[in-house]
Amino acid sequence: MSDEAARRVTFSFAAPVDNAAAWNLDLDVFANGLLQAFPGASATREGELGPHPSDALRIEIPLGGGAWLEGLVTMPYPKVGSVLALTASAAEAAVLARWIRDFYAPSPDLVYFTSDLALDQGATDYGQIPSSGDTQAIACVLQEHIDDMDE
């Protein structure tokens, strides 16, 4: 599933800014669901990270063909946090985004995203993951985001 030539960025997936606790984030529940959905995946507690103490969970998801997606789930406040797809192509990050949308978020319209590329450019608006559609549809939205930021 890995595309070596694809542009890689770090994507951040989260609940809507105006309803940050909408996912009711729980690292143990997240880890258990991820491990069940992706055989061979790993989820390891990292403890507190960053300037504001934040519980964290390091994740690795097998994508096939020897490719892996690395990620980090951080929870700086109870029930509130984000999920990072680290240095990923749009297609790779879409696998994680779809799982969050379809199996973790309580409603498919509660998954928003940004990227390190956007934040580096001062962009503060979050995009929304489509509330329906397959992994390819999500990958297209993420790739459009990268393309817009690269212009």
Q: Where are each of the predicted segments found?
A:
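Extended, charge-rich low-complexity interaction segments
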Residues: 75-90, 141-151
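Helix N-cap motif at beta-to-alpha junctions
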Residues: 20, 89-92
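Short, intrinsically disordered low-complexity segments
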Residues: 33-87
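Exposed regions on extracellular, virion, or secretory-pathway luminal proteins
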Residues: 64-65, 91-92, 104-107
